[in-house]
């Protein structure tokens, strides 16, 4: 008898949303099929699936142990959210010499259904960062006697829903800052900045209306600007590693001495980025809106307003939808492309992004005085769910400047 061959082994998910992307939340049932195509008859010991969800953090730091001694310190941490195994065909027996229990699969295409329930407890949103990731996947393993197993892994996306309609995320965010410039024994007038946004919570694709007033009573030319930043924080062995990513920005008009500029709802659009991750013990993803004044030859005047990027968009006034899935479906279109099937081990960050790309796209910001330098870098943080989409293009110059605000002298004469 001529034994057949395995032509293909694939995994497909039953999607719960209109965009046909496998996206789930805690408590959902993940279901799908393992698709097997064979040419000729084959004998099978077992067809298994293994589903797992986990967050993992890893980075290294160089240490000096003496004048001529150095070593590398590894920091790793992992949190497992679920671990499910099931046998679709056959049994666990590993003895190839035992003829009993082998299954015969005939030539053609075959489907084997699987399903499992995600935990009811909160799950971290799928994410791929500089020093860690949150991944969810299903692996299929086909075991045959006297042959190496055929394995395939496919990821799916999990969103831990954040409803921006909660009172804490609907509250306005505001602040005021002032700075006086000094040069030797001379002191110029102050530069003042006040800014306000209507709420704390937003979803990708929305535009933030920025209300601000910038008053320049110094002797220098200054430029008001705004930027959205993503902060990734990774925790392991009592240590923390932080990376800041620039997401989007805009620039106002230059202000000469004695001038004032008012932003009456200047718009800054949020590109497709990962939602905030606030409930994971080893990975945290937060966002902030930086409204600041670029001052040549001095530290920038910075005002930071916290943001939360959610998954359930703002309800129109007076209307409520009936379910979380329907609320979230309108926000799934920007997922765009499904995650590909993978070999057994998911690719590392370094395998997906070259070292040169990583240096260019993930420039960290270490301090406020590096803020302007960071604004010259790329404007899109690397996110796993959206890594197959081209990065959005943004200009530092606002394409729709507010023409209503005019420079006007407002500082007291000196």
Curated annotation (Swiss-Prot):
Keyword Membrane appears in the UniProt entry: yes
Motif (PPxY motif 2): 391-394
Motif, PPxY motif 1: chain positions: 346-349
Region (Disordered): 393-414
Record bears the keyword tRNA-binding: no
Pfam families per UniProt: Arrestin_C, Arrestin_N
GO annotation, cellular component aspect: cytoplasm; early endosome; endosome; lysosome; plasma membrane
SMART domains: Arrestin_C
GO biological process, one term: temperature homeostasis
GO MF annotations, alphabetized: beta-3 adrenergic receptor binding
SUPFAM superfamilies: E set domains
Keywords noted in UniProt: Cell membrane, Cytoplasm, Endosome, Lysosome, Membrane, Repeat
Compartment(s) where it occurs, according to its Swiss-Prot or TrEMBL record: Cytoplasm; Cell membrane; Lysosome; Endosome
Main location: cytoplasm
Membrane topology qualifier: Peripheral membrane protein
Any coiled-coil regions, as ranges: none
Basic and acidic residues bias: start-end ranges: 405-414
Assigned protein family: Belongs to the arrestin family.
Subunit structure: Interacts (via PPxY motifs) with NEDD4 (via WW domains). Interacts with ADRB2. Interacts with ADRB3. Interacts with HGS (via PPxY motifs). Does not bind TXN (thioredoxin). Interacts with ITCH.
Function description: Adapter protein that plays a role in regulating cell-surface expression of adrenergic receptors and probably also other G protein-coupled receptors. Plays a role in NEDD4-mediated ubiquitination and endocytosis af activated ADRB2 and subsequent ADRB2 degradation. May recruit NEDD4 to ADRB2. Alternatively, may function as adapter protein that does not play a major role in recruiting NEDD4 to ADRB2, but rather plays a role in a targeting ADRB2 to endosomes.
Protein's name in the database: Arrestin domain-containing protein 3
Protein source organism: Rattus norvegicus (Rat)
């Amino acid at each position: 008898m001529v034994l057949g061959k395995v032509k293909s082994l694939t995994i497909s998910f039953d999607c719960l949303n209109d965009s046909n992307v496998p996206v789930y939340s805690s408590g959902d049932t993940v279901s799908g099929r393992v698709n097997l195509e064979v040419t000729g008859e084959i004998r099978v010991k077992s067809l298994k699936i293994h589903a797992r969800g986990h967050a993992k953090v890893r980075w290294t730091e160089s240490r000096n142990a003496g004048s001529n001694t150095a070593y590398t310190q590894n920091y790793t941490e992992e949190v497992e959210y679920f671990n499910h195994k099931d046998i679709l065909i056959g049994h666990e027996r590993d003895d190839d010499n035992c003829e009993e229990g082998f299954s015969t699969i005939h030539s053609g295409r075959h489907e084997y259904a699987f399903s499992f329930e995600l935990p009811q407890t909160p799950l971290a949103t799928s994410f791929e960062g500089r020093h860690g990731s949150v991944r969810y996947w299903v692996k299929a393993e086909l075991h045959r006697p006297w042959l190496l197993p055929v394995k395939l892994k496919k990821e799916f996306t999990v969103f831990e829903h954040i409803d921006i309609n909660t009172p804490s995320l609907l509250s306005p965010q505001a602040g005021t800052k002032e700075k006086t410039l000094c040069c030797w024994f001379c002191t110029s007038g102050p530069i003042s900045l006040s800014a306000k946004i209507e709420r704390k919570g937003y979803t990708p694709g929305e535009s933030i209306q920025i209300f601000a007033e910038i008053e320049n009573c110094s002797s220098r030319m200054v430029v008001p600007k705004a930027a959205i930043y993503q902060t990734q924080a990774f925790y392991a062995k009592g240590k923390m590693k932080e990376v800041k990513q620039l997401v989007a920005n805009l620039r106002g008009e230059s202000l000469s001495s004695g001038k004032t500029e008012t932003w009456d709802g200047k718009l800054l659009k949020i590109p497709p980025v990962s939602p905030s991750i606030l409930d994971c013990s080893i990975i945290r993803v937060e966002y902030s809106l930086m409204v600041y004044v670029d001052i040549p030859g001095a530290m920038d005047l910075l005002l930071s307003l916290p943001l939360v990027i959610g998954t359930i968009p703002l309800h129109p006034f007076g209307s409520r939808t009936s379910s979380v899935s329907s609320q979230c479906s309108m926000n799934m279109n920007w997922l765009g492309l499904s995650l590909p099937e993978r070999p057994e081990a998911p690719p590392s960050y370094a395998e997906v992004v070259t070292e040169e790309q990583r240096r260019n796209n993930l420039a960290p910001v270490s301090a406020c005085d590096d803020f302007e330098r960071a604004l010259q870098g790329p404007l899109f943080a690397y996110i796993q769910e959206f890594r197959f989409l081209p990065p959005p293009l943004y200009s530092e110059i606002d394409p729709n400047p507010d023409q209503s605000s005019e420079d006007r002298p407002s500082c007291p004469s000196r």
